[in-house]
Regions:
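Sec-dependent bacterial lipoprotein signal peptides
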Residues: 1-23
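OB-fold and OB-like single-stranded nucleic-acid-recognition modules
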Residues: 18-115
Length: 115
């Protein structure tokens, strides 16, 4: 019985460690906007409320406001609706254009979670 408890504790600790190392830490948007070169081509996580969105045929861009600033997120999935709370992770890029509109610094989404 003691061996089973030890194995369970070990698996829980191992799973937690893997989850923490696999996820990028959440970064506030003001830091990204203040120094986008520091974050360029690095994976970051952000979370906030969707304030604007543009979608075309399953792709698009949406803007997240985390209370410290706003940033556009480029997605190959459908865009979330305005007012939604989401968490997104991806890579920071500059000079992004979509449907003839320039978005400046953007997060290229690799994963999204609704809150």
């Amino acid at each position: 019985m003691l061996a089973l408890k030890k194995a369970t504790v070990f698996l829980v600790l191992l799973s937690g460690t893997l989850l923490l190392t696999a996820c990028p830490s959440q970064t506030n948007i003001a830091k990204i906007n203040r120094d986008p070169d520091h974050y360029r081509n690095k994976e970051v996580g952000i979370a906030g409320r969707v304030t604007d969105s543009y979608g075309v045929m399953g792709t698009g861009a949406y803007e997240i406001d985390d209370g410290t600033g706003k940033i556009w997120v480029a997605t190959k999935q459908g865009v979330p609706s305005r007012g939604s709370r989401v968490g997104a992770k991806g890579y920071i890029h500059s000079g992004f254009s979509f449907a003839g509109r320039s978005f400046g610094t953007v997060l290229e989404e690799t994963d999204r979670r609704s809150k």
